[in-house]
Design a protein with these regions (language model features):
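Exposed alpha-helical structural elements
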Residues: 17-20, 73-81, 140
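Activation targets extended, charge/polar-rich intrinsically disordered C-terminal tails
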Residues: 99-152
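Extracellular cell-wall/glycan-interacting regions and their flexible linkers
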Residues: 1, 48, 52-53, 64-73, ...
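A structural motif
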Residues: 74-95
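Glycine-rich catalytic cores of cysteine/serine-nucleophile enzymes that process amide/ester linkages
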Residues: 10-69, 97-105
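Solvent-exposed, acidic/flexible segments
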Residues: 27-30, 71, 75, 110, ...
């Protein structure tokens, strides 16, 4: 897909009970994150429980966003990573064992929303240390990118 603009978007609404629970548990403003490409496509791991790309009309009342500077390398990485992970399932085990029970376990073939975003963007920017993406929350991703010069 040709990418003209790309944003990391963070779900801030309390529409669903699990959004409130996630925000409370992680002491965060956000319960979910994905990429928003060309102001049209929501890309990432979703409520549908797998990595997908779908047309979506984003509401600024429900989502905050950070626009990234687009370049050829980022465009290639996004397309390549999406192609490799498309259809990968949501990693509920990592959420429960790593974020609730602090067991630091994950399935490398499954992702949480923030894990998928962090791993993809770290291929371009190399800014997450240590590389334990499965331990990150949407708020962690927001904090890293809102404090860097990688945004427009």
């Amino acid at each position: 897909m040709k990418i003209n603009n790309i944003k990391i978007v963070f779900y801030k609404s309390n529409y669903r009970w699990w959004s409130r629970l996630i925000k409370w548990w992680t002491n965060s403003s956000y319960s979910h994150c994905e990429l928003y490409i060309n102001n049209t496509y929501l890309v990432g791991i979703s409520n549908e429980q797998s990595v997908r790309c779908k047309k979506y009309d984003l509401s600024s009342e429900k989502w905050d966003s950070i626009e990234l500077k687009i370049d050829n390398k980022l465009e290639w990485i996004v397309n390549d990573f999406f192609e490799k992970t498309q259809g990968a399932k949501y990693d509920w085990k990592a959420i429960i064992l790593s974020n609730i029970f602090n067991r630091r376990l994950q399935n490398t073939n499954k992702y949480t929303c923030s894990e998928w975003i962090a791993e993809l963007l770290d291929l371009r920017y190399n800014i997450f240390q240590p590389k334990k993406y499965y331990m990150l929350t949407p708020q962690d991703v927001y904090d890293v990118f809102s404090k860097n010069e990688l945004i427009e």
